[in-house]
Amino acid sequence: MTPTLETKYVFTITARIGDVTSAGEIGTGVRRIIPILGGEVKGEGISGQVLPFGADFQIIRPNELIELEAKYAFETDDGAVVYVENVGIRFGPVELLRKLKRGEPVDPKVIYFRTRPRFETGHPNYQWLMQYLFVGSAARHADRVVIDVHQVL
């Protein structure tokens, strides 16, 4: 018998995003690039600002399943810079996904949006971010993405 898989909420990343740039149909779907403009990180024992660079690189598959790969960084209030590489998928009813693409509001509970963030930092206070696996439950809004990050125990 293996250990029970459990998670614990640790913090929320709110990333402000810019306008979508499309590279068009690439044979496997439509490639989109969405700049990350800034934001905040808030949680128990960690808080800071999302730095104003990086992007979310997406492929929208023909069935509207969206594969995401975001690369960016945040700086904690005590000066640690943390690099983030976050991969995931977003899926739901086609019409609701199209509403999201148009910037229209959609109830996040009806869209499956999960991620696997990975963190890197040399700061001793945050080495634990590189010693565990994390998963995220996310919501897309017109001007931001909100990710609740959970540590896999």
Swiss-Prot record:
Pfam families: DUF3237. InterPro entries: UPF0311 (IPR020915). It comes from the Bacteria. Belongs to the UPF0311 family. NCBIfam families: PRK00872.1-1. This is UPF0311 protein RPA1785.
